[in-house]
């Protein structure tokens, strides 16, 4: 893998002078190897190592090089045609291959090559971009989007119209990460490398970016960029110091342990905050 990484890194440093005509066959093969590895789950743009998320920027560089070097081509989807640099993941998939994958793909769900979809995942009419990693047992509901390089854990439910932000550039930016057993409510947006830790529930219409204040009503603390494990989060507002206005925030209304999260329904967890 090191030689593959070195080849990608060197080419990216010299990307301004590269074209499809000048790129070596070794480089083209390396880019295709990375895209195939992302597609089958061999590679991940981000992974948890010793309890911390590590981002492999060189994989993002390979994707960006593919955009620069590969020409647009016609993609025949049967009901219409597309014109893009990256083919669709399931265009040539046979019945046997679908059965082996264990994935259900409802008509009009779109997945680009280079996104990994694990078994027991259901894709309603939705969009999954290149470099995304979707683990086992995930539901991606209607009109939801999973952006480039986003990382989705096991047994996550991404509700209708929700958006999980993607990131390829700038290279220093981290992907958005939803850890295991999380629920993302309808029309919510989680973007800009925000991490939602395991067993959390995000209510409908919650917007989370790096500049979004996250208010913990239990402790009174304000944080940014990360939802702690087991949090139940709703949309809210915080007043200004002079009381002249209020600004949007996300509110952690409670935190539950894994056993409670498993036993109590999503609706009960969200309704509980209305009694206070």
Curated annotation (Swiss-Prot):
One Pfam entry name: Hexapep_2
GO molecular function list: 2,3,4,5-tetrahydropyridine-2,6-dicarboxylate N-succinyltransferase activity; nucleotidyltransferase activity
Superkingdom assignment: Bacteria
Involved pathway(s): Amino-acid biosynthesis; L-lysine biosynthesis via DAP pathway; LL-2,6-diaminopimelate from (S)-tetrahydrodipicolinate (succinylase route): step 1/3
EC class (word): transferase
Keywords for the protein's UniProt record, in alphabetical order: Acyltransferase, Amino-acid biosynthesis, Cytoplasm, Diaminopimelate biosynthesis, Lysine biosynthesis, Repeat, Transferase
SUPFAM superfamilies cross-referenced by the UniProt entry: Trimeric LpxA-like enzymes (SSF51161)
Residues that, per the record, bind substrate: 104, 141
Catalytic function, reaction form: (S)-2,3,4,5-tetrahydrodipicolinate + succinyl-CoA + H2O = (S)-2-succinylamino-6-oxoheptanedioate + CoA
Annotated compartments: Cytoplasm
EC number: 2.3.1.117
Keyword Ubl conjugation among record annotations: no
Assigned GO CC terms: cytoplasm
GO biological process per UniProt: diaminopimelate biosynthetic process; lysine biosynthetic process via diaminopimelate
InterPro entries named among the record's database cross-references: DapD_Trfase_Hexpep_rpt_fam (IPR005664), Hexapep (IPR001451), THP_succinylTrfase_dom1 (IPR023180), THP_succinylTrfase_N_sf (IPR037133), Trimer_LpxA-like_sf (IPR011004)
Principal place of residence: cytoplasm
Assembly and oligomerization: Homotrimer.
Similarity field: Belongs to the transferase hexapeptide repeat family.
Stored PANTHER family: 2,3,4,5-TETRAHYDROPYRIDINE-2,6-DICARBOXYLATE N-SUCCINYLTRANSFERASE (PTHR19136:SF52), MOLYBDENUM COFACTOR GUANYLYLTRANSFERASE (PTHR19136)
Listed name of the protein: 2,3,4,5-tetrahydropyridine-2,6-dicarboxylate N-succinyltransferase
Lineage of origin: Bacteria, Pseudomonadati, Pseudomonadota, Gammaproteobacteria, Legionellales
């Amino acid at each position: 893998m090191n030689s593959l990484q070195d080849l990608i890194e060197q080419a990216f440093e010299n990307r301004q002078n590269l074209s499809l005509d000048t790129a070596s066959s070794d480089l083209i093969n390396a880019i295709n190897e990375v895209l195939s590895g992302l597609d089958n789950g061999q590679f991940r743009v981000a992974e948890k190592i010793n309890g911390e998320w590590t981002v492999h920027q060189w994989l993002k560089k390979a994707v960006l090089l593919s955009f620069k070097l590969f020409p647009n081509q016609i993609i025949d989807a049967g009901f219409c045609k597309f014109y893009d640099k990256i083919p669709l993941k399931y265009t040539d998939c046979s019945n046997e291959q679908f059965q082996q994958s264990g994935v259900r793909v409802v008509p009009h769900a779109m997945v680009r090559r280079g996104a990994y979809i694990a078994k027991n995942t259901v894709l309603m009419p939705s969009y999954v971009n290149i470099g995304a990693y979707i683990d086992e047992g995930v539901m991606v509901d209607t009109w939801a989007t999973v952006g480039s390089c986003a990382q989705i854990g096991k047994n996550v439910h991404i509700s209708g119209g929700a958006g999980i932000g993607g990131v390829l550039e700038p290279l220093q930016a981290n992907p958005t990460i939803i850890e295991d057993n999380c629920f993302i409510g309808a029309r919510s947006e989680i973007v800009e490398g925000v991490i939602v830790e395991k067993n959390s529930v995000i209510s409908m219409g919650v917007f989370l970016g790096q500049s979004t204040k996250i208010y913990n009503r239990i402790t009174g603390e304000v944080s940014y960029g990360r939802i702690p494990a087991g949090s139940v989060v709703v949309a809210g507002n915080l007043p200004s110091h002079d009381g002249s206005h209020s600004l949007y925030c996300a509110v952690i209304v409670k935190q539950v342990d894994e056993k409670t999260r498993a036993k109590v329904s999503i609706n009960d967890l969200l309704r509980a905050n209305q009694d206070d």
